[in-house]
Every structure is written in structure tokens, then in C-alpha cells.
Amino acid sequence: MAVLTGTAKIRFGVADTADDMEENTHGHGREEGGIEVEAGVGDVFILPAGTAHKTFDTSPVTEFKLLTPGDGHHILTKGSDVRETLANVQLDGFTMVGAYPKGGGEWDFATGGENRGEYERVWSVPKPENDPVLGKAEEGLCGQWR
């Protein structure tokens, strides 16, 4: 995931335990543990498959929307030109983009719980050929993923 515009808090490693958004965001309606970070433009996060993460307290404040046209499972294009579709995306508010390794299987925008019990499928994401930031460097995914 990479932050393109704005700032936000991101909580990693714990799931919500309450349906109330205020309670699960700022109260105790979530699992114990996890970490919270302040994220800003240029920050990049690489997460192991299946890691819970939640973005909140975004700035500037705007209504939530998917960055790309579609339903969160693929990019809808006019014709078949994904590059043209992406070039026309307007960035505003807090914008973060996510990606999966090439050949890493089906991706989706999950809002929580959809993949419960599907651990083998979630954890079977193959080791990528390149780290998205560090390429094949030992310090990146290629050297650290064992």
C-alpha cells in the first residue's frame, strides 16, 4: 500500500469486534494488540497476506470512495486500456493505493470478514519476483521472505 495524498492513521494486526464505527475505531470495539501509525504522502506498507488493517482519521476529510472504477475486485475500463483509465483518476482527500504481486492470484477490496476460514487461500500468495520499492535487494521482500 502506498499513500498518494493526505494523511491518516492506520491500525495493523487487529480486527474490529463491534459493529459501531465509533466504538471499533476510537473505543474498545477491537481485538487487543496491533499497532497504529501516522501515514503520509510517500509512505509504503508491505503486509503479509491476511493482515488486518484499518484506515481512519483521514485528512483532508472526504467521503470514502474506491480509487478506481469498479467493484473492488477489478478495474472497470472503457474498452481494455487500464493505463488510460488510471491516468484519468482524480486524486483528492486521503488517497492510498494497494497492489498485489504479479501472478499473486485474485485481489479484492475487502471490508472485513469476507475471507474468514479461508486461511490456506489467503496465505498461499506466492513470493513476488521483485519488491515494489527495493527490487531484488536483500533488504526487501526478495531477501526477507523465507
What are these model-predicted stretches?
Residues 1-17, 46:
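Short, conserved beta-strand element in jelly-roll/cupin
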Residues 2, 8, 39, 52, ...:
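Small-side-chain structural scaffolding
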Residues 11, 19-20, 54-56:
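Short, solvent-exposed loop/turn segments at secondary-structure junctions
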Residues 16-18, 61-62:
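Short, surface-exposed beta-strand-loop junctions and turns on beta-sheet-rich folds
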Residues 25-26:
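PEST-like low-complexity intrinsically disordered regions enriched in Ser/Thr/Pro and acidic residues
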Residues 30-33:
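Short alpha-helix capping/helix-loop boundary micro-motifs
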Residues 38-59:
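Conserved metal-binding segment of the jelly-roll/cupin
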Residues 58-146:
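Double-stranded beta-helix
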